[in-house]
Amino acid sequence: MANESTYAGISGLVANVYEVALQAATEGNVVAPFVTTFSDSQSSAPRIFGSYSGGTFATVAEDGDLSAQAFNADAGGTLTPAVYGSQALLTTRRIRSDPANATREAGIHLGNAAAQEIDTNLAGLFSSLTAGTVGTAGGTLTWANIFRAQAYIRTQKVFGRYACILHPVQWYYLTSATSGVPTLMQNTSIAESIIGNFYQASFGGIDFFVDANITSGTAAIGGMFARDAIALDIRQPFAIAPQWNASYSGNGAWEVNASMEYAYGVYRPLHGAILKGTSE
């Protein structure tokens, strides 16, 4: 039989779709590079986590002895994984007529779908950060709000640099203020990295990014946080599986199925603050 449609005829196409999709998914995700990421399990079982508290250092007399202190974890929360997926349908006619274009379009479609899903889920967690809240619904964020949010987190003894991720219009209002705008710096290593397209500036240990996946409105919620404030638990990395549908379109089509399995949630809520303000 001539002109069979077999996997051998599409293997290169699928590989290219995967490469383009993975690149699009990676480049389109703003929040993920700044959160705690787990990748040590392929199980679909929930991950239960906790935190330790208590314990003090005290003087010990020369004739004294140390006393044991409680060392138990308090329940913190649960990360429950779920499968997320998207599909591109490539007919035989489309593949034969313009395979390079079909490859690119399918890859971008699947990658963008994955990136938007993950990023929207992570950005939606900003409203669950508990170190403090700055700004008001209907108001515009100010630099005083920014530094107050930083102070809220520092008060929790959270060390390291913080990421501040805002809706693009929230950032616009900050930088268009007529007074009180600090002299912002550029971190070259961030600007030239894969996340550089979303990077705006740095100041005082804070790196600023914009993310259009933050829900827009008069009370848009941005976040300032340390890495361990939010967790992303990947059980199955981004993958693509093709499936042949012989009856579709008369002479068949390839279903290019993309999927991931992951969990996400607030990990250390006190290690982040809410920045509320209009994005309209």
Model regions and ranges:
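N-terminal "assembly arms/tails" that initiate or stabilize quaternary assembly
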Residues: 1-76
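C-terminal interaction module
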Residues: 174, 192-243
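Short helix/loop capping segments that flank catalytic or ligand/cofactor-binding pockets
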Residues: 57-59, 98-99, 173-176, 265-267
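Extended, solvent-exposed, turn-rich assembly/linker loops in the middle of proteins
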Residues: 128-202
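Short acidic, glycine/tyrosine-flanked loop/strand segments centered on an H-E-D-like triad
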Residues: 74-97
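Alpha-helical scaffold segments that mediate packing/assembly in large oligomeric complexes
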Residues: 91-160, 274-280
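Protruding loop/beta-arch "assembly-hinge" segments enriched in small, turn-prone residues
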Residues: 1-30, 201, 226-280
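Short, structured patches in soluble enzyme cores that scaffold and shape functional sites
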Residues: 92, 166-168, 260
